[in-house]
């Protein structure tokens, strides 16, 4: 994937199939390509970013927190070493900056104190510029990336980094919530429902078999990914149960709230989720998936819906279906 060094504030808008890159600093006349310096598979200039991931679930009304996990991320914007001191001084003092400014229709302001380093080679230090790449922006909204990248670059000017000084990325790196949410999604696991039913033994033809998801499986799931002060949390709430049967039956296919647990004394009409088998069978399997409402929240105030899983996990049970037998012995009553 080709990247070009652009004037500060300029935008290279590629097609939807290619990355969009923003780079701070003036264009170099020698055709310098930052790809040669910034290795994305083994980037020595960007610290390895460790994102903390925590998972919470609700069980029987109580919140259960899992052990924290870690993930790794590449920031969408970072600093990279670009110009040597004499190069940058020649660029501005030799007139090339003015010619490029005319070509791009922009004003190029030199970094503060650039003449102080006009004789400083790599043994003294190097100028570092800001770079952003949509390769590390997992959201398909390219306009959101451009807005974020423009703000980041405008607030991170080209700086001189002396030899032996800390990597400027140590303080500059930020992972925005828009990136963290995808890490949280990767860690989100939505369980299959654990099903209970009544009768607990064999079912009976033409009588409803109650079905419901247990409290332990019909439970909210949360995953939060955090780096520094930024975080994104994905919240998945079960809102229903979908049933199917591998044979002839009347089925409440969409059961709100996971079904109604059976209690002695409840009428047959009290159930919100049942299967009525129409024929006897040695074995019938009832399968179910949970219906999830999923959204995410971020440290920046974001609260947006997310798509539920396309192929949710399936829970099931197998039951024998019997006919009701009525026996009349013909003995007259006395």
Language model segments and positions:
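Short acidic/polar micro-motifs centered on Gly/Asp/Asn
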Residues: 238-266
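Solvent-exposed segments in extracellular or luminal domains encompassing
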Residues: 260-287, 292, 297
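Solvent-exposed N-terminal domain segments of exported/luminal and surface proteins
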Residues: 30-169
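Short proline/glycine-enriched turn/loop motifs at strand-loop junctions of beta-rich domains
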Residues: 218, 235-239
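A short, structured loop/turn motif at beta-sheet edges
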Residues: 202, 244-250, 278-285
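Secretory targeting and sorting signals
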Residues: 1-29
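Short beta-strand elements
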Residues: 301-328
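Extracellular-facing segments of soluble proteins and assemblies that are Gly/Ser/Thr-biased and enriched
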Residues: 133-230
């Amino acid at each position: 994937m080709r990247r070009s060094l652009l004037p500060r504030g300029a935008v290279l808008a590629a097609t939807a199939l290619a990355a969009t890159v923003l780079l701070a600093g003036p264009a170099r006349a020698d055709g310098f390509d930052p790809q040669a310096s910034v290795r994305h598979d083994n980037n020595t200039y960007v610290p390895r970013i460790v994102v903390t991931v925590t998972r919470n679930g609700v069980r029987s009304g109580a919140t259960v927190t899992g052990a924290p996990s870690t993930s790794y991320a590449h920031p969408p914007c970072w600093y990279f070493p670009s110009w040597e001191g004499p190069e940058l001084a020649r660029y501005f003092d030799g007139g090339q900056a003015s010619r490029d400014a005319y070509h791009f229709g922009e004003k190029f302001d030199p970094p503060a104190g650039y003449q102080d380093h006009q004789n400083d080679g790599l043994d003294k230090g190097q100028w570092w510029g800001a770079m952003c790449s949509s390769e590390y922006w997992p959201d398909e909204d390219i306009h959101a990336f451009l807005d974020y990248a423009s703000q980041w670059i405008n607030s991170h000017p080209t700086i001189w980094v002396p030899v032996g000084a800390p990597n400027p990325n140590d303080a500059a790196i930020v992972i925005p919530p828009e990136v963290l949410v995808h890490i949280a999604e990767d860690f989100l696991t939505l369980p299959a429902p654990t099903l209970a039913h009544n009768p607990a033994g064999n079912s009976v033809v033409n009588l409803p078999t109650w079905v419901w998801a247990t409290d332990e499986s019909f439970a909210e799931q949360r995953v939060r990914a955090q780096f520094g002060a930024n975080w994104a949390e994905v919240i998945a709430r079960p809102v229903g149960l979908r049933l199917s049967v591998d044979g002839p039956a009347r089925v409440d296919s969409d059961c709100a709230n996971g079904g109604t647990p059976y209690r002695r004394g409840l009428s047959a009409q009290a159930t919100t989720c049942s299967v009525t088998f129409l024929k006897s069978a040695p074995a019938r399997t009832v399968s179910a998936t949970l219906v999830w409402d999923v959204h995410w929240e971020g440290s920046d105030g974001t609260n947006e819906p997310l798509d539920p899983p396309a192929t949710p996990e399936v829970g099931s049970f197998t039951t024998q279906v019997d006919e009701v037998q009525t026996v009349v012995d013909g003995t007259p009553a006395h």
